[in-house]
Each structure stands twice: as C-alpha cells, then as structure tokens.
C-alpha cells in the first residue's frame, strides 16, 4: 500500500467515524437536549480525534461546541477529487454532497510512523480562496 493510499484510508475512516458520531448524537441532542449526553458525546469525539488527528489544542470547533446536524456534515459519500503527497505531508481535496456541497481541503501529517489529520479548510467561492474550517 502506498503512503498516499494509507493517508487516504485514515481520512476516509475519520469521515466515517465522524458521520456515525453525528448520526448518533444529533437526534439525542435535538430530542432530549445536550446536557444529558454532553459528557458521553465529548468523550466519544475526543476518542475519534485522538485516533485520527494531530495532537494539539483546538480552542474552537466541534470538540468545544459538540455541533452536529441533519444531514451530517461528514458523509461517507464525500468524494476525494485530488491528492498530493510531499514528503511528510499529504493534501486531499474532497467534494461534499450533503448540506452546502462544499469543497474541503484536508492536510495530513506523517509523524511517528502514522498519518494524522492536521487541518481542514473550505473553499470560499465568494472569496475565491481556501479558508480555515474547524474539524
């Protein structure tokens, strides 16, 4: 398996697990409120991030807000449009087919013999550039 294939496998598995997390917690939050499930949702989300993402403090984003929706932002149908490998960094551009049909750019880093997702960006057609987007 090539390094590019290994990195893509990490990205796809992350997307699948995030999709499952959203599918599980969105109805619970909507129907019963966040308070009852906040701790369990945070733990499961932290476990996903610990498994797939670079180890760094994320002061904003899903780990803080526990945001999820219907349809889920993450979908197994998200298509990889292009990929690029450069030494210890791999970049994937994907197309979302749910919600706003965004284009995303994921950057993965190779550290300690494994690929980890470091950041996510969304292409802004209005600004005609990639902008930071929370994982």
UniProtKB/Swiss-Prot annotation:
Domain of life: Bacteria
Protein name: Immunity protein RhsIA
Organism: Dickeya dadantii (strain 3937) (Erwinia chrysanthemi (strain 3937))
Role, per record: Immunity component of a toxin-immunity protein module, which functions as a cellular contact-dependent growth inhibition (CDI) system. Specifically inhibits its cognate toxin RhsA. Cell contact is necessary for growth inhibition.
Entry-linked Pfam families: Imm-NTF2
Disruption phenotype: A double rhsA-rhsIA deletion is outcompeted by wild-type cells, restoration of rhsIA restores normal growth in competition experiments. Restoration of growth requires the RhsA-specific immunity protein, rhsIB does not restore growth.
Region (Disordered): 58-77
């Amino acid at each position: 398996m090539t390094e590019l294939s290994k990195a893509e496998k990490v990205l796809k598995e992350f997307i699948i697990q995030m999709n499952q997390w959203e599918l599980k917690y969105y109805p619970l939050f909507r129907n019963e409120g966040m308070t009852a499930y906040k701790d369990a949702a945070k733990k499961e989300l932290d476990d996903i991030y610990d498994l797939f993402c670079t180890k760094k403090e994320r002061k904003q984003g899903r780990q803080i807000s526990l945001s999820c929706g219907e349809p889920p932002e993450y979908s197994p149908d998200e298509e990889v449009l292009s990929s690029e490998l450069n030494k210890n960094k791999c970049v994937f551009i994907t197309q979302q087919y749910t919600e706003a049909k965004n284009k995303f750019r994921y950057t993965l880093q190779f550290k300690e013999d494994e690929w980890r997702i470091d950041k996510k960006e969304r292409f802004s057609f209005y600004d005609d550039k990639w902008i930071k987007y929370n994982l």
